[in-house]
Amino acid sequence: MTKTNFSLTARQREDIMKVYGEIALTCHSQQEAYIKVASHPAPRYYVSPKQAFERLRRMVVGDFSEVDAMTEPRRRMYYSLFEKLKKVSQRKEFIGQSLHFICQFLVSEPAPEFFLSPVSVQYIFNKCKRYGKDFRDNK
């Protein structure tokens, strides 16, 4: 895992824990909290501009095969980025700019959700509580 990707992962974990703290007070169970956190709006897309560029450049020319083979949350994330790309590329300041340039701004836009399953949120929550947000997966 590269340093850049890990900083995104740590930031995502921080944001998940923050949202969990806000949402857990109104939930009747932890499972309900995990579900609500997973569908809660996120402050950004947790993907690097390079990764977004690699997937979106194929989608722009009509090749959705790589994205369609992904897990459901990841697929939703890239389709959401693609829809946002269509809107953002029509803005005056982005007309005529390269996809690579646009992706740098696109991934920092607010995301409609965290694009994680409730099980993943639970895993992250438990690991963060036990080891802190900087734990490394041994997968």
Where are these regions (language model features)?
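Short, basic interhelical loop/turn and adjoining N-cap
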Residues: 38-55, 104-127
